[in-house]
Amino acid sequence: LLESIPGCSNQIASAIISEIKDIKRFRSQSALAKYCGLAPREHSSGERIRHFVDRRGNRKLNNAIHRLAFGQLGSNCKSPGRWYFVKKVKEGKSKLSALRCLKRKIIDIVFQILTKREKYKFKFSSCYDLNKDLKIPA
């Protein structure tokens, strides 16, 4: 089922499944993202509140999601992940922050696929123009 995601090879899919084991362990997409290390952590002291990336998650799962995200960002790839990444960069996010957003989106999709037991289907909407230039801004 995971191989229906663009850029997901057999090796990446098996790595994701072997690290997640049973999807029923996670009550929500947020719980899976936290397990993977993709959910932001809050660090507060007094009036100051900051959010940072949690590095304590499952690094093997995070690495598999990272490889999947880069598979969607290929130079000639017209995947939904590339559109999402370009959209986030054009919104003003740094490339690293946009990559984090893409990884979180992918882990949400993985959760949906494994809970619903359905292949991934991307519906093109008006915001995704096939003829649009998908070059990543410098």
Short names for language-model regions:
Residues 90-138:
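Basic, amphipathic alpha-helical segments enriched in Lys/Arg and hydrophobic/aromatic residues
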Residues 1-4, 10-95, 131, 135-138:
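Phosphate-backbone recognition surface of nucleic-acid-processing proteins
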